[in-house]
Amino acid sequence: MLRGESYNSRDERLLTTAHRARSLLATFTATPSTDSAQRRAILSELLGEVGEDVWIEPPFFCDYGENVYIGTRSFVNFNCVFLDSAEIRIGANALIGPSVQLLTPSHPLRAADRIVIAESLGENESPYRTHALPIRIGDNVWIGGGTIVLPGVTIGDNVTIGAGSVVNSDIPSNSLAFGHPCRVQRSL
């Protein structure tokens, strides 16, 4: 899964990790924002790494949590979705706007390649082929609300991504980029 190879999303270990993440996310969401120590403890247990002074506004959603790494002084706004079937690495001082989606998993484009014939499935096997590629976000990045970042994308340092963008390719450092698809508009 973490190497970009096809994986079974119904694997017993993955399901156990996903159920654990959902339980921690429910507790995180129910914890008052005034109890920052408890919220931080939950994030430290949930995520692969959480830097100092990281703030995540609930609701927040992730698949497993253990593949998410967030650098110091980063802020994740309301309603963000991090599908972390591969690593999601966010640098320091990042601002992630509301309803941003960081999506590492994908599926083959052709239905014949994507769908597994039911007769050949084992008991705990997914009927869909899935693979994942990592997402990397540099330091000092601002991703505007409603942006979708697709599998395998790297966003460099000091980048601003405009709201509502669909980022399907790498964005170099020191850039302003936006659009559907997201394209560099100018250097910063």
What are these model-derived regions, one by one?
Residues 60-70, 75-153, 180-181, 187-188:
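Flexible, glycine/small-residue-enriched loop-and-beta-strand segment within the central core
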Residues 1-53, 109-112, 120, 182-188:
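Terminal amphipathic alpha-helical/low-complexity segments used for targeting or macromolecular assembly
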Residues 148-182:
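C-terminal/domain-terminus segments
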Residues 32-33, 64, 84, 171:
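Residues at alpha-helix boundaries and short interhelical turns
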Residues 1, 138, 156:
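Short, acidic, Ser/Thr-enriched surface-loop or helix-capping motifs
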